[in-house]
Amino acid sequence: MATKFPAFNQGLAQDPTTRRIWYGIATAHDFESHDGMTEEKLYQKLFSTHFGHLAIIALWVAGNLFHIAWQGNFEQFVLDPTHVRPIAHAIWDPHFGSGITEAMTQAGADGPVNIAYSGLYHWWYTIGMRTNEQLFQASIFMSILACWTLFAGWLHLQPKFRPSLAWFKNNESRLNHHLAVLFGFSSIAWTGHLVHVAIPESRGIHVGWDNWLTVLPHPAGLTPFFTLNWGAYAQNPDSLEQVFGTAEGAGTAIFTFLGGLHPQSEALWLTDIAHHHIAIGTVFIIAGHMYRNTFGIGHSLKEITEAHNTRHPLDPHKGSFGINHDGLYETVTNSLHFQLGLALAALGVATSLVAQHMGALPSYAFIARDYTTQSALYTHHQYIAMFLMVGAFAHGAIFFVRDYDPELNKDNVLARVLGTKEALISHLSWVTMILGFHTLGIYVHNDVVVAFGNPEKQILIEPVFAQFVQAAQGKMMYGFNALLSDPTSAASVAANSLPGNHYWMDLINRQDALSAFLPIGPADFLVHHAIALGLHTTALILIKGALDARGTKLIPDKKDLGYAFPCDGPGRGGTCDSSSWDAMYLAMFWALNLIAWVTFYWHWKHLAIWQGNVAQFNESGTYLMGWFRDYLWLNSAQLINGYNPFGVNSLSVWAWMFLFGHLVWATGFMFLISWRGYWQELIETLVWAHQRTPIANLVGWRDKPVALSIVQARLVGLAHFTIGNILTFGAFVIASTSGKFG
């Protein structure tokens, strides 16, 4: 008999119903639950999947490079980066009539093309690429890299090349390798590229394979390095009049501390970026020599964690926190879910910071003036951050169900957190209620008084504390005279005593959207608290799901039921919606809600500044109808008109996606609201009809059709809700911004 899917779970493969297909898909990547899985095999399989992941990334990068080199307009963009709209790729579509063909033939192309809003053109331009040939070469290199990493993944599954479990659990060596080699060396290597290729290109000096060994990146060569005269590398920076990409106004410095933006490219100074990378690379290389290596040199992580407790004779909290970090070393070492949770949380925070800083401190030349790209990149990175953060809590909960050992962690910080979960959860609950009632109350009050013609009766609160923080960083307009905004303060005196010119105060006090700190008022105050509500509610649901994963008063044996379980069986009334999986599922809706508010805020505030109409956000952002009418409705107008009875324009694809996104989103509710019985009856009706329909009934199947379980239907519903939500808002952001600014 042929092997039935899933091959990795023979118990499931014997299931006579369609359930085996869905459970097979659900557990395909849950290696821990597969037949014959050992801890060593689990680590080896995961290690190999990392190489597969790298191959996919390399292939994706190669595809972007190849299509832009083949069908894009990179060389034209290089000649005039502020006016040439970058092309992502050509479109060949049999559905296109003459109207849409004409509308999509744009940016100087011969036929229909898509415009690129990825920022790739700006990045490649900034790092010194200038020709299509260079893009093709990079594409070939990335394709070879993809093949190489795929081979590495396959190789490490072969018996001779499988690393041992002890190798995977050698924490100190892994940390040293990741810190010094992966982070440290790659940062230094990137500095090398910036200094040897990107900075010369930004000054009109071409460096290629033909001359890179003969063009000195700095007139003094390595002499200042070996004579410890490192300051020489910071002397003679580019002038404020430098024309990016040319020798006009160019200097010779390679590592600077100028601060602010290059006046023409409106991006961070490349020499500042190079300085950042060499500094951080050096720090990481030092950090990579911190932990105990094979020769016994360095610190033991176990000793560090166990010394970090309240039994130290000089500790003022002696004994009051239990035994703090004892047992944590073994717990983290032996739990992949704990490690993954930590990694996802760290990467989630970093990704959200990337979103913020790509707008506040743009690092790529001329990208700050490509408003659609800036909006798309902000939105993209915030949504990615949301998924990573929810994933962090999900794996934290799985850790508590599958990997947590109460004996090993007795009275340490993990046990203490579990022991005080009621206080943690109730405080978070209280915070969300305070935030929710007050914020909504003020918004609704303002709506009512505006609706009745008394806008002057709105409750408008100046964000004085946030304004003070901005003033401390040097924002002059509020008149606070604090730290950097007070020329006589110790901070200002210290800043002014640094040798050379510095431009961060100019950046902070700019009058346009590129100011590092945009002016804030009552509308910002309100939306800040709405976002705080979203953050705290999402956190509440996720933290409760993780802390309650092992058991609650209602279900004391929850840990035995696993991470996801339905309302399961007799005598279990009222146990629906109580698995940790349910918490993750519910938190996703709040997280999507939250990221919508975050991106609405960023996008509308920037649209208003870019259009020279700051008052629109400041005045309409203080009541809900202002948001609905002057942001959502007003900016949907062009979108809805992408195609109409009178013809189409280049926004039509986004108009269609906006419509389709709403459809996908709404489909989610069909799965979310109706429960199992409905689907079972529907399926049985369809099967009955199929079996009685001539010709159709020639097709049969062996599996008995069984409806989706509650958990499965929720997953299908959540997937549609999420994808529809993102499709809708993505189309909205791109079309509403590009419709205004081209």
Swiss-Prot record:
Keyword entries, A-Z: 4Fe-4S, Chlorophyll, Chromophore, Electron transport, Iron, Iron-sulfur, Magnesium, Membrane, Metal-binding, Oxidoreductase, Photosynthesis, Photosystem I, Thylakoid, Transmembrane, Transmembrane helix, Transport
Listed GO CC annotations: photosystem I; plasma membrane-derived thylakoid membrane
Residue sites binding divinyl chlorophyll a B3 per the record: 670, 678
Main location class: membrane
Localization per Swiss-Prot or TrEMBL: Cellular thylakoid membrane
Transmembrane segments: 46-69, 135-158, 175-199, 273-291, 336-359, 375-401, 423-445, 525-543, 583-604, 651-673, 715-735
Binding site for divinyl chlorophyll a B1: 662
InterPro entries, per database record: PSI_PsaA/B, PSI_PsaA/B_CS, PSI_PsaA/B_sf, PSI_PsaB
UniProt name for this protein: Photosystem I P700 chlorophyll a apoprotein A2
